[in-house]
Amino acid sequence: MITSRVLRFPRKPFVDLDYSRHMPAAYVERTKRTVPRKVFGDRFGAPDIKMYYVHPDDYLPSHRRPWEDKQLSSHLQRSDKYFSAQLSNKYFELRRPKSERMPDTEWTFFPGDLVQVMVGKDKGRQGLVLTISRDSSEVVVDGLHTRLGEDMEGSEKLGVDKTLRWQEQPLSVSKKQVMLVDPNDENPCEARWQLNASADEYIRVSTRSGYEIPIPSQAKVTYEYLQPENYIEVEGKDTPSDAVLERTYMPRVASFEQEIMEEMGIKEDRTPKPTFWY
């Protein structure tokens, strides 16, 4: 009875809208270097001791994706410093500002949204969101809040002239450095999630005017496709959903070795020796 009621609740698809939603979670954690380096188990009932490359509490979030080359090299350097601090029995200096991840139900920014910058030299200007970072609760706006920086660091050592370009800097959502634009009057506003009139889907509305702020199509872009309806399955490589959902495993009171022996037609005539536990 309770299960049927839960299944009738409207889904919250905005929680899953992320570029890496189809990437294996284990791969993303490895690029962040927040996985155990070694696990000391079999401690007679005591919890396992885990030695991390970088403890998840000490992870340094960024507006860049963790698998990008520059960010990955930064994570590798940080994990080496973290490990050397453990070997020398010293405290690891974090030297980073505290940033808390906003709850998924409160996050209302997606790539392609029209937003307005509230701080800096571009205060009051509007632009489109390029990328978002859920870990650091930051967004990058196309062509706004920029800073002049090197296009490729260390290029002069390779005999290439140093080139400069304007680079977009992240804007914090939790500090309200950037706000959504209300489609009613094109002024900055805050947004919230609420059920639509038929109570079967969550929509994003402005808290000031109550107008719906539609989710842009760019928010559905993932590593696998640009739009889910345009995705084409590759025969021989993509497993069809019908084959994935087909139930083929039948639980039996037998070990893995016994099941293999039955399939191969092997009969066991030997009598096992008694086993004693102390």
Curated annotation (Swiss-Prot):
Keywords: Mitochondrion, Ribonucleoprotein, Ribosomal protein, Transit peptide. GO terms for molecular function: RNA binding; structural constituent of ribosome. The gene is mrpl-24. Belongs to the universal ribosomal protein uL24 family. Gene3D superfamilies: 2.30.30.30. It is found in: Mitochondrion. One of its GO terms (biological process) is translation. This is Large ribosomal subunit protein uL24m. It comes from the Eukaryota. GO terms for cellular component: mitochondrion; ribonucleoprotein complex; ribosome. Residues 109-142 form the KOW domain. Its main location: mitochondrion.
